[in-house]
C-alpha cells in the first residue's frame, strides 16, 4: 500500500504524487510512518543503503536501475588517542556528499510515480546528487543554484546532463526561482527541503551507524545543519530504530551552524519555539549558510527532543578543523569541517560521539 503524506500545519493526508510537493494550505509535508524496522529483513547481500529496502517507500525492483551503490560508508577514528570520537565518511558516496542518500530514494520514487522531469534547487551538493540519479534514471533535470555556487559543483551537475540555472542572490532566491518553475504536468519538485521522500533516504545513515556498531547506538551525533536535511533524516532513522527496540536510547543530536549564519542556533539559545530569518554575513561553510530555513522550526524541535544542542563555529575554527583532518588523510569541504570542529570541542568522557563528514574537499577547492 502506498504511503500517505501528512501536512505538518493542518494534518491533511493525501497520496504521494508527482506534482504535489506541499499541502494546499502551504504547509510542509511529512511521510506517514512505514513498516517496522527489522534487522532480520536487512538484505546482507546488498552492499548499499538498499539493504534497508523494507523501510523505504519504493517497490521491490525499480531501485536496481537507479542505484550507484550509495551507502555503507566507513566509520573511522581520525584523532589519535580519541577512540570515542568517530567520523562517518559520507563524502565517499558516489557524487561526494551525503545528499546521495536522499537523491537515490527520491529519484527512484519519482521514476515509480511516472515523473517526466525533475526540478531541484541547491547550493551545490543536492543539485549534483539529483542530477546524477536523474541521469541514471533517464529523467530530464533542471537545477537552480545561487550564482555564487563554486564552479566545481556546477560543472559536476552539468556533466550529468542537467540544465543548471544560476540565480543572482541568495540560496533562498534560488529556491524561490525553482518553486516558480514547478507546476508542469509530470514534473516533480525534487527538493531536499520540501519533498519528504528525500528524508527517507537520509534516514539510512542512522540504520548504518547502528548496524556498523553491532546494533548499538552512539551517545551523541554531531551534524552540520543548514536546511536540516541531515538532522531530520537521521532523527527519522533513529526513531525507527527506537520504535523497534534497537540500540537503546536514541543519541543526543548536536547540530552545527556557521557563526555568520545561524538562525536555528539563535532560536535555540534564546529559548524561542520559532526560527526567525537572519542575515547571511558570509562564511566558508556556504553549504549550511541558510538564512531562512523552511524546516527550521522542525529542526529546533528535533534537537531539543533529543536532549541535544545547536552550536556555532567560526570560520577560523572551521579552517583549522579542515587542515587537521587533511593532515590525517581526510579531505572534506568546509561544511563538514565545521561539524568536526564542533565535535572536537565537546568534552570527552560522555560515551561515543559520531560526526558525519558530509562533503568532499574537492567540492570547494
Ranges and model annotations:
Residues 1-365:
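PLP-dependent amino-acid enzyme catalytic core
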Amino acid at each position: 500500500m502506498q504511503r500517505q503524506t501528512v501536512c505538518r500545519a493542518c494534518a491533511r493526508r493525501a497520496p504521494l504524487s508527482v506534482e504535489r510537493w506541499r499541502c494546499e494550505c502551504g504547509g510542509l509535508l511529512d511521510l506517514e510512518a512505514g513498516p517496522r524496522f527489522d534487522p532480520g529483513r536487512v538484505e546482507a547481500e546488498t552492499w548499499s543503503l538498499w539493504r534497508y529496502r523494507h523501510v523505504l517507500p519504493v517497490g521491490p525492483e525499480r531501485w536496481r536501475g537507479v542505484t550507484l551503490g550509495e551507502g555503507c560508508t566507513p566509520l573511522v577514528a581520525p584523532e589519535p588517542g580519541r577512540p570515542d570520537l568517530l567520523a562517518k565518511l559520507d563524502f565517499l558516496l558516489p557524487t561526494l556528499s551525503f545528499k546521495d542518500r536522499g537523491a537515490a530514494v527520491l529519484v527512484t520514487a519519482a521514476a515509480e510515480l511516472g515523473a517526466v522531469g525533475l526540478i531541484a534547487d541547491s547550493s551545490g551538493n543536492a543539485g549534483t546528487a539529483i542530477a546524477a540519479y536523474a541521469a541514471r534514471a533517464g529523467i530530464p533535470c533542471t537545477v537552480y543554484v545561487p550564482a555564487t555556487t563554486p564552479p566545481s559543483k556546477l560543472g559536476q551537475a552539468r556533466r550529468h546532463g542537467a540544465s543548471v540555472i544560476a540565480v543572482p542572490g541568495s540560496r533562498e532566491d534560488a529556491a524561490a526561482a525553482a518553486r516558480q518553475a514547478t507546476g508542469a504536468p509530470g514534473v516533480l519538485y525534487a527538493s531536499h527541503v520540501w519533498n519528504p521522500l528525500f528524508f527517507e533516504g537520509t534516514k539510512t545513515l542512522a540504520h548504518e551507524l547502528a548496524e556498523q556498531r553491532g546494533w548499538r547506538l552512539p551517545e551523541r551525533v554531531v551534524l552540520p545543519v543548514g536546511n536540516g536535511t541531515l538532522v531530520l533524516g537521521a532523527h527519522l532513522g533513529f526513531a525507527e530504530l527506537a520504535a523497534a527496540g534497537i540500540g537503546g536510547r536514541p543519541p543526543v543530536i548536536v547540530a552545527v551552524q556557521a557563526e555568520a549564519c545561524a538562525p536555528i542556533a539563535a532560536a535555540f539559545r534564546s529559548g524561542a519555539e520559532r526560527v526567525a530569518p537572519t542575515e547571511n554575513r558570509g562564511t566558508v561553510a556556504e553549504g549550511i549558510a541558510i538564512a531562512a530555513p523552511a524546516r527550521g522550526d522542525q529542526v529546533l524541535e528535533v534537537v531539543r527532543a533529543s536532549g541535544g544542542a545547536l552550536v556555532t563555529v567560526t570560520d577560523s575554527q572551521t579552517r583549522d578543523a579542515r587542515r587537521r583532518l587533511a593532515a590525517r588523510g581526510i579531505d572534506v569541504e568546509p561544511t563538514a569541517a565545521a561539524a568536526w570542529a564542533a565535535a572536537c570541542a565537546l568534552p570527552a568522557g560522555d560515551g561515543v560521539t559520531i560526526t558525519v563528514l558530509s562533503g568532499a574537499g574537492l567540492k570547494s577547492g
